[in-house]
Amino acid sequence: MARSPVLDRRAPAAAAPRRSRRRRLRLGWSLDLLFFGYPLFWVLGLHSFAWQLCAVPLLGHLVLQRRVRVPRGMGVWFTFLAWNLLSVTQLQRSAQLIGFSYRYSLYLSATVVFLFVYNAPTALLPLRRVYSWCAALWITTVAGGWLGVMVPNGGFTSGLERVLPSRLAEDLFVQDLVHPSFAQVQQFLGYPLGRPQAPFAYTNHWGAAFAILTPVVLLGWAHLNGSRYQLAPQLLLTASLVPAIVSLNRGMFLSLLVALVYASARSGRVGANARRALLATLVLVVVLLAVTPLGNLAQERNDNQHSNSGRATLYGQALDYAGRSPFLGFGAPQEVEGDLLLPPVGTQGQIWLVLVSHGYVGALLYVAFLLVLFRDTRRLPARTSVAHLLVVVALVEMFVYDLLTVPHHIVFLVVAAALADKRRAADLESSPTTSGAA
């Protein structure tokens, strides 16, 4: 019997979407490169610029889009970005323009990531792919942490460092950005201790990244894979706790503790698999602290409050600087007054950075946008509920850590994916086909 011509036409029609899907998948190639190839960026000395570099193809895609959707409340963030530009007029030295440009480029790259993910089709960016990206960077973070524990004095000259002009490469700020080191060796406990920092510029960046990525690995994968694949994440989590504890990042542990308590209080939202993952995590931490020398190390850190007075001084001076220029700030962190051994005012927490650099108005806009994200992610389904938890972590971390690199981009990435998932579900429910079927 002869084939129906209608059936004959279906074969090429089915092939066309597959070819189209392959073309669309290429649009996210730079994010694949960033998350799965982050160690390469680190070796090349480009890790501090990875987000900006990978945002360029994403921006190109957005520019070519006929329509770019923007979620409600995004105007607050755009106003914050505009206020940042006004603050550049307050810079007191031309050299400060380098730091300002670097920080502003990170704000812009996070914005591009958010808009790209929010507008990407489901076939291109399913939740599984977003969570896989975060898991890959988390594994890299843990591996770098172990490198810092095992070889604390390790480091090497990066590819970028080799080609930079010597005058630029010797600049301390540039050195921090382009020279890979395994750990920051400090002696505040009375003996040298390597606090992991690889593959980031500072140990605080390592702690901030670990705190923001761990909930995604635990909760995101718990929802996607159920109980079948929980053994591997739990084994990796067990291994990660050693460099996490050795890092002595109190802000990291505070953030994770708040996340754990908050998620437990919202257990109905996070789901049964996530509750099991959270409980297993808590048990692992307690056991490690109780039966290994890591418990003694954590106790020594708690007993040694060496940094409390320094941070109090920096926070007090941040408020003082903000009072001198309450509207536009100073455009950049400022030199500390008095104790010259302390880092610049505005470098020990995102909120203090914004306050000193962009004044009370900038700080208000920044916090307002985080609260907008908190509101908009509060009632997400279990599969994307981790987005809300990341906003909570960011609200805690902003007082102690710089969020410009990994934390901002991960929060924007996961929140954008969650809000896009929520929007698609709402569109599906309100579509004529769905209504007619009902």
Residue ranges and their predicted role:
Residues M1-W29, Q65-V68, L288-V291, V415-A438:
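A juxtamembrane structural motif centered on a specific transmembrane helix
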Residues P17, R21-G28, G60-G75, L218-L235, ...:
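Membrane-interface helix-loop-helix junctions at transmembrane boundaries of multi-pass membrane enzymes
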Residues S30-W42, V56-N119, A143-G144, R379, ...:
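N-terminal hydrophobic segments of proteins, predominantly signal-anchor/transmembrane helices
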Residues Y38, Y131-F156, S166-S247, F253-R266:
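Alpha-helical transmembrane segments of multi-pass inner-membrane proteins
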Residues A55-V63, V386-L395, L404-A438:
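Transmembrane alpha-helices of multi-pass inner-membrane enzymes
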Residues A143-G155, S264-D303:
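A membrane-periplasm/extracellular boundary helix in multi-pass inner-membrane enzymes
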Residues Y229-P233, S240, L257-V261, A265, ...:
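Hydrophobic transmembrane alpha-helices and their immediate junctions
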Residues L294-V361, L373, T377-L380:
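Long extracytoplasmic/lumenal interhelical loops at the membrane interface
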